[in-house]
From Swiss-Prot:
Pathway(s) served: Pyrimidine metabolism; UMP biosynthesis via de novo pathway; (S)-dihydroorotate from bicarbonate: step 2/3
Assembly and binders: Heterododecamer (2C3:3R2) of six catalytic PyrB chains organized as two trimers (C3), and six regulatory PyrI chains organized as three dimers (R2).
Lineage start: Bacteria, Pseudomonadati, Pseudomonadota, Gammaproteobacteria, Pseudomonadales
A GO molecular function held by the record: aspartate carbamoyltransferase activity
Name of this protein: Aspartate carbamoyltransferase catalytic subunit
Family in the record: Belongs to the aspartate/ornithine carbamoyltransferase superfamily. ATCase family.
Assigned EC number: 2.1.3.2
Length: 334
């Protein structure tokens, strides 16, 4: 467990309910299942003529993105709006911090807006934990991705995608392929799969993109794609982070695709009903060929749909946990 993850109890209130959502590390299986079940119940909201429920009416959700991500920000906005919350979205990367304002100063200014919840995305690992530790007690903090550390809502939407297509996790073989080293998605997926009882978790990639000691997550390591994909039920492709290419970790994108790109021929080594996932954005012809990304095995667009429901679940559960903690504190202060 890393020092960041050692702060995990911060996420729960005194009744064991979700209060912040910062990492999947150490969260009990029952809580992860509750998130998935709640998300399942929210899926039908998206099919309604009026796509709203009043659970967060009168609450303000502030999306604070120190790092750009149109997809994640948009799905959090939709999730909050469908819960009837008021939504503020700030691209802090182009505002105060670029003028020298510290994270702590930014936090204090955001608190002055009297928001009830912050969704935070930051390039530094641990940023969401820092904010959760220092924000006023009534505010919930959701991690929208922090450095290489965690992307817990992506992890849970991946789990919902798998569960809706494959049912139980107990008999599944899941392969995570690509840039494991820099991927917060890979870390969150590995933690969630292990907690939910998946017995066979594989990571596949070049040696230079696989972290030392990754076996502690309970995974099997493969550096040969064909061997790693043999008879798997689920293939999760990761974005090759091109900004890392300058570090000499890969000779070229073409070489990566030649050895680790998912093609129709290579996918044939997986089970006939295998599903293919990708957190996006996709680099076609680098991680995956278009015939696979758009083919019958792909559930990539389903992931986007399920992501809104998962984020609705997390927002509503965290707000409920904050309310319960506030009531608990008031009763015990009397």
């Amino acid at each position: 467990m890393t020092p960041i993850d050692a702060k995990r109890p911060l996420q729960l209130n005194d009744q064991g309910q979700l209060r912040h959502f910062l990492s999947l590390d150490g969260l009990p299986r029952e809580l992860l299942t509750e998130i998935l079940d709640t998300a399942d119940s929210f899926l039908e909201v998206g099919a309604r003529a009026v796509k709203k429920v009043p659970l967060l009416r009168g609450k303000t959700v502030c999306n604070v993105f120190f790092e750009n991500s149109t997809r994640t920000r948009t799905t959090f906005e939709l999730a909050a709006q469908r819960l009837s919350a008021d939504v503020i979205s700030l691209n802090v990367s182009t505002s105060s911090t670029s003028k020298g304002e510290t994270l702590f100063d930014t936090l204090r200014n955001l608190e002055a807006m009297a928001a009830d919840m912050f969704v935070v995305r930051h390039s530094d690992s641990g940023a969401a934990h820092f904010i959760a530790e220092h924000v006023c007690p009534d505010v919930a903090v959701i991690n929208g991705g922090d450095g290489r550390h965690a992307h817990p809502t992506q992890g849970m939407l991946d789990m919902l995608t798998i569960r809706r297509h494959k049912g139980s996790f107990e008999n599944l073989s899941v392969a995570i392929v690509g840039d494991i080293l820099h991927s917060r998605v890979a870390r969150s997926d590995m933690l969630a799969l292990k907690a939910l009882g998946c017995p066979d978790i594989r990571v596949i990639g070049p040696k230079t993109l696989i972290p030392i000691g990754i076996e502690q997550y309970g995974v099997k390591v493969y550096t040969d794609l064909a061997e790693g994909l043999k008879d798997v039920d689920v293939v999760i492709m990761l974005r090759l982070q091109r900004e890392r290419m300058a570090g000499g970790l890969l000779p070229s994108e073409g070489e990566f695709y030649r050895l680790f790109g998912l093609t129709t021929a290579r996918l044939a080594g997986a089970k006939p009903d295998a599903i293919v996932m990708h957190p996006g954005p996709i680099n076609r012809g680098v991680e995956i060929e278009s015939a696979v990304a758009d083919g019958k095995h792909s559930v990539i667009l389903n992931q986007v749909t399920y992501g809104i429901a998962v984020r609705m679940a997390v927002l509503s559960m965290a707000m409920s946990g904050q309310n319960a903690q506030r009531q608990f504190d008031q009763e015990n202060a009397q």
